[in-house]
Amino acid sequence: MTFSEILDRVGSMGPFQYLHVTLLALPVLGIANHNLLQIFTATTPVHHCRPPPNASIGPWVLPLDPNGKPEKCLRFVHLPNASLPNDTQRATEPCLDGWIYNSTRDTIVIEWDLVCSSNKLKEMAQSIFMAGILVGGPVIGELSDRFGRKPILTWSYLMLAASGSGAAFSPSLPVYMIFRFLCGCSISGISLSTVILNVEWVPTSMRAISSTSIGYCYTIGQFILSGLAYAIPQWRWLQLTSSAPFFIFSLLSWWVPESIRWLVLSGKYSKALKTLQRVATFNGKKEEGKKLTIEELKFNLQKDITSAKVKYGLSDLFRVSILRRVTFCLSLAWFSTGFAYYSLAMGVEEFGVNIYILQIIFGGVDIPAKFITILSLSYLGRRITQSFLLLLAGGAILALIFVPSEMQLLRTALAVFGKGCLSGSFSCLFLYTSELYPTVLRQTGMGISNVWARVGSMIAPLVKITGELQPFIPNVIFGTTALLGGSAAFFLLETLNRPLPETIEDIQNWHKQVQKTKQESEAEKASQIIPLKTGG
């Protein structure tokens, strides 16, 4: 008997599972808020230099840019006796007395003057947040293995609530960045524990539905963020409103049961049995729960206990050629997806469209994108779907280079299309990666893939800074990287309708079988070629 069969005895899809998935899914609504929060809390408004204190305010104080608007980062050197208000030949200087902002919102950019020479600090703040997610993955993963999934989930909720609230009261930008880094670490803990506890307690036949439901909560969270940002123009209150609910989620998480596999592998058989009996009672199968014993639990999960004793590490991903290929191609696909996704998701204000409406559109495109991706995965296969999603996204991003800024509708349509393709790419990669890696290396493979996605999302804001050299440079980098990721996916094995590989030998045999079939097909085609006879 496997754990799935034990789960069937206590109720594999009853009231417990519905409540369990709901409690795991609700906090995901808030995860979207934190991931994309700087779209609204770090908006850069129209601005220009503040005139010197002893100058009379007027158009002549500021030089004009080629569009006839006040320069953002320069002003005329103030000469008290100057008599020519429109004299464009006068010397200019940086904004020594600060800036005047044309905005009804309060943002970190306005509060800490993150413009002109300091504008890189805005992108750095987002990169530091992403670095927190990157660092939090392995650190919290190790803590999760040591202390359990449930305590780490509860602690991560509490940590996100505290660090997010701390960011709302930050007295300076460095303090704000530290708290945002901790927010990123917390999100890693929440994501890791949510995935594991969802898979643990839901039957195989329902995992796709439950996982998709949780994924759609992230999409809904993007809608909620737009509404909150519109209603709350002060960045500190918006930050606090997005963080405070996690105090409540930390309390609700005490109801969520611990992973049975973790309890068994940790030798906590008595607690594992009590947890299963509690689930059985909740699902109306109390008598079935009473029949379970510790000895039965040990016997039926012996395979899990034995397999856990064999340790596989990162080096095993590079032991054989096919695994090296899979790891390289998947790493590039994950990196390019995270890299390009956040270039679009965090660039809402660049398209000259109302950011609240555009954020709703960016969130809404995920719904049809993920649905179409699921259909394509089921009928066209994983490899083709993954390749074309990244190739289409890369093409859309590169096309933005050739569309003038005045054509806002077309630029927005291309960005929305690209973002939808990248959302589908994420959905495809989660499934594809879990199917390509053998069971003994699946967790390690997913871990290294997640790292590359986070590296991409961390670097993306910094690459945007290259736009100061030439506006088209960031899109060239983002688009080309997506094309490379899509091309790499063509070299992966197709997993549609194939059983999951269990061991390294399984994937080697699978690769040999594919190679043999390909060679036989080429030989058959060659045998059908009729040589042309030359005249004598």
From Swiss-Prot:
<comment type="similarity">
    <text>Belongs to the major facilitator (TC 2.A.1) superfamily. Organic cation transporter (TC 2.A.1.19) family.</text>
</comment>
<dbReference type="GO" id="GO:0015132">
    <property type="term" value="F:prostaglandin transmembrane transporter activity"/>
</dbReference>
<feature type="region of interest" description="Disordered">
    <location>
        <begin position="515"/>
        <end position="536"/>
    </location>
</feature>
<feature type="glycosylation site" description="N-linked (GlcNAc...) asparagine">
    <location>
        <position position="81"/>
    </location>
</feature>
<keyword id="KW-0597">Phosphoprotein</keyword>
<keyword id="KW-0472">Membrane</keyword>
<dbReference type="GO" id="GO:0042910">
    <property type="term" value="F:xenobiotic transmembrane transporter activity"/>
</dbReference>
<dbReference type="GO" id="GO:0016324">
    <property type="term" value="C:apical plasma membrane"/>
</dbReference>
<dbReference type="GO" id="GO:0015697">
    <property type="term" value="P:quaternary ammonium group transport"/>
</dbReference>
<dbReference type="GO" id="GO:0005080">
    <property type="term" value="F:protein kinase C binding"/>
</dbReference>
<dbReference type="GO" id="GO:0034635">
    <property type="term" value="P:glutathione transport"/>
</dbReference>
<dbReference type="GO" id="GO:0015711">
    <property type="term" value="P:organic anion transport"/>
</dbReference>
<feature type="topological domain" description="Cytoplasmic">
    <location>
        <begin position="202"/>
        <end position="212"/>
    </location>
</feature>
<dbReference type="GO" id="GO:0015651">
    <property type="term" value="F:quaternary ammonium group transmembrane transporter activity"/>
</dbReference>
<dbReference type="InterPro" id="IPR036259">
    <property type="entry name" value="MFS_trans_sf"/>
</dbReference>
<feature type="transmembrane region" description="Helical">
    <location>
        <begin position="12"/>
        <end position="32"/>
    </location>
</feature>
<feature type="transmembrane region" description="Helical">
    <location>
        <begin position="181"/>
        <end position="201"/>
    </location>
</feature>
<dbReference type="GO" id="GO:0006811">
    <property type="term" value="P:monoatomic ion transport"/>
</dbReference>
<feature type="topological domain" description="Cytoplasmic">
    <location>
        <begin position="145"/>
        <end position="158"/>
    </location>
</feature>
<feature type="topological domain" description="Cytoplasmic">
    <location>
        <begin position="1"/>
        <end position="11"/>
    </location>
</feature>
<feature type="topological domain" description="Cytoplasmic">
    <location>
        <begin position="433"/>
        <end position="471"/>
    </location>
</feature>
<dbReference type="Pfam" id="PF00083">
    <property type="entry name" value="Sugar_tr"/>
</dbReference>
<dbReference type="InterPro" id="IPR020846">
    <property type="entry name" value="MFS_dom"/>
</dbReference>
<dbReference type="InterPro" id="IPR005829">
    <property type="entry name" value="Sugar_transporter_CS"/>
</dbReference>
<dbReference type="GO" id="GO:0009636">
    <property type="term" value="P:response to toxic substance"/>
</dbReference>
<dbReference type="InterPro" id="IPR005828">
    <property type="entry name" value="MFS_sugar_transport-like"/>
</dbReference>
<feature type="topological domain" description="Extracellular">
    <location>
        <begin position="33"/>
        <end position="123"/>
    </location>
</feature>
<feature type="topological domain" description="Cytoplasmic">
    <location>
        <begin position="258"/>
        <end position="327"/>
    </location>
</feature>
<feature type="topological domain" description="Cytoplasmic">
    <location>
        <begin position="376"/>
        <end position="383"/>
    </location>
</feature>
<feature type="transmembrane region" description="Helical">
    <location>
        <begin position="355"/>
        <end position="375"/>
    </location>
</feature>
<feature type="transmembrane region" description="Helical">
    <location>
        <begin position="472"/>
        <end position="492"/>
    </location>
</feature>
<keyword id="KW-0325">Glycoprotein</keyword>
<dbReference type="GO" id="GO:0015732">
    <property type="term" value="P:prostaglandin transport"/>
</dbReference>
<keyword id="KW-0445">Lipid transport</keyword>
<feature type="topological domain" description="Extracellular">
    <location>
        <begin position="349"/>
        <end position="354"/>
    </location>
</feature>
<feature type="transmembrane region" description="Helical">
    <location>
        <begin position="412"/>
        <end position="432"/>
    </location>
</feature>
<keyword id="KW-1003">Cell membrane</keyword>
<feature type="transmembrane region" description="Helical">
    <location>
        <begin position="384"/>
        <end position="404"/>
    </location>
</feature>
<feature type="topological domain" description="Extracellular">
    <location>
        <position position="180"/>
    </location>
</feature>
<feature type="modified residue" description="Phosphoserine">
    <location>
        <position position="4"/>
    </location>
</feature>
<dbReference type="GO" id="GO:0005452">
    <property type="term" value="F:solute:inorganic anion antiporter activity"/>
</dbReference>
<feature type="transmembrane region" description="Helical">
    <location>
        <begin position="124"/>
        <end position="144"/>
    </location>
</feature>
